[in-house]
Structures are given as structure tokens and as C-alpha cells.
Amino acid sequence: MLQNIRIVLVETSHTGNMGSVARAMKTMGLTNLWLVNPLVKPDSQAIALAAGASDVIGNAQIVDTLDDALAGCSLVVGTSARSRTLPWPMLDPRECGLKSVAEAVNTPVALVFGRERVGLTNDELQKCHYHVAIAANPEYSSLNLAMAVQVIAYEVRMAWLATQENDETAEHEETPYPLVDDLERFYGHLEQTLLSTGFIREGHPGQVMNKLRRLFTRARPESQELNILRGILASIEQQNKGK
């Protein structure tokens, strides 16, 4: 089940950080590392700092875009240390661990970490169902990438161990949630429908689509509910064609 949890690093710029992250992951039983458009490729320094977790580096999936890394996932959590223009559903690391383990019973989960200096962009954070923030010392809150991964990975492991000690499988939802791919298709369909009705203007959607993403992220529709919404959009399009 832990194999279903992806640690996703976006545009990492130092190979040593890749190795340190691999070590942090493996100590907590996580091995599924994804590298999104890394600015450098894993090298001997990454292997050296992995300190016995070189297999995690060797098996890492290297992809061009964040969408590639999120494909097939039903839950995405992005790390964020900064306040944003649009508030987003937040988790603390413990809640993140519990949700990740519960969801990973059935489908892949992505825990996304940003660039060493600037983290994740607003656009990248809007692809996440939740944001997670580590409550570090406000007078000195500087966690490096591997430290942040270690904190989250520890909480994932604690949540997983709790299910083992109770001789139970992780609690999971009976009703399936749509994968990230399905949600992105829905958002594309929604934007196209709003354009065709004149609700938003071509090239100038303003904050409407961002706020709608936040609304549906907060509501987190089930797969059947998303299908209903897609059906409504299709019906609107059909009516427009008949005019």
C-alpha cells in the first residue's frame, strides 16, 4: 500500500537533495519517487547522500510536467509555507498522513514538494486537493527539502503503522473519487462551456476558473457526481448548438 504513495519533487536543482530525500523516504518505508523536470539529473552525489537508498534514486520516475506525475492519482497534497491569494483546504502533517494512507488503499496518492527556493507556484498548488503546512518555529522556519519530506513521510508511516497494529486495513472510502486526469478534463469542459455561453471571455477568465477550482476542490465530488456535472455541461452545449 505504501507503494501507492508518490513523493513528487518539482524542478529540483541540487542532486544532493534528491539523495537526501531518497534516504528520508526509505527510512519511512516509501520508495515511489517522481522527479518533475529536474534541473539536474541524479548523479554520484545523489547516490552518496542517499546512503543506502540508491535504489529509490535508480527507480525514480523522471517526467516533464506535474500533470504527468499526478496522472492516475485520486488525492494530491501540495506543501506550502506561504499564504496565497486564494485560501485552500489545509492539512497539518498528521492529517496528511492519515488521509494519504486511507486513500492509498485503493488508488495512488501524490505528495508534492516544490523548488528549493520558491516552492510550488500558485498554478501548481491549484492542482492539489489539499495543502499541507509544517508548523515549524515561526522565528526560524527554514526547513530544507529533505527535512520537509522527512516530516511528512514520518506521519505517513505512523498512520500506516496504526492500521497494522490494530490488525486492520487502512480506513478507506467506499465511494470512488475521480482521478486527477478526470478532474482536469472536467475543468477544461467547464471552461469551454462558460466561454461558449459568454460567462467568461476568451483569454480573460479572471479569477472565475480559479474560484471554481477551489469550490470543487473543497466539495470533492465523487466520481458519479462528476459524471452528472459533465452531463449538465454537455446538455448546455447541446442547447447552445440548437439556437
Curated annotation (Swiss-Prot):
UniProt keyword Electron transport present: no
Major enzyme class: transferase
Assembly with partners or alone: Homodimer.
GO CC terms, sorted: cytosol
A Gene Ontology molecular function term of the record: RNA binding
Gene it is expressed from: trmJ
Family: Belongs to the class IV-like SAM-binding methyltransferase superfamily. RNA methyltransferase TrmH family.
GO biological process, one term: tRNA nucleoside ribose methylation
Gene3D superfamilies in UniProt: 1.10.8.590, 3.40.1280.10
Name recorded for this polypeptide: tRNA (cytidine/uridine-2'-O-)-methyltransferase TrmJ
